[in-house]
Amino acid sequence: MAAEPKAAVEVVKVDLFEDDDEFEEFEINEDWLEKEEVKEVSLQWEDDWDDDDVSDDFSRQLKKELENASEKK
């Protein structure tokens, strides 16, 4: 059998920084920074965010498991 010629393999170079061209650079506008006020962040949950309903099945089961684990120690 005759040796078959190898197909030319084309190596594609990937430019890792090619995507950087898609974003436009903006200068920092100091007037905009001065006008922006720091707004007080409202609480997203109560300070005591624990589940108020301790009578649900999960709470009872968890409490039972914790008691069993502490007894085994």
Curated annotation (Swiss-Prot):
Pfam families found in the cross-reference section: DSS1_SEM1
CC per GO annotation: proteasome regulatory particle, lid subcomplex
Keyword set, alphabetical order: Proteasome
SMART domains: DSS1_SEM1 (SM01385)
Biological processes, Gene Ontology terms: mRNA export from nucleus; proteasome assembly; response to hydrogen peroxide
Transport as UniProt keyword: no
Domain of life of the source: Eukaryota
Record-annotated disulphide pairs: none
Self-association and partners: Part of the 26S proteasome. Interacts with BRCA2B. Interacts with EER5. Interacts with UCH1 and UCH2.
Task performed by this protein: Subunit of the 26S proteasome which plays a role in ubiquitin-dependent proteolysis. Also associates with the TREX-2 complex that is required for transcription-coupled mRNA export.
Family designation: Belongs to the DSS1/SEM1 family.
The protein, known as: Protein DSS1 HOMOLOG ON CHROMOSOME V
Organism: Arabidopsis thaliana
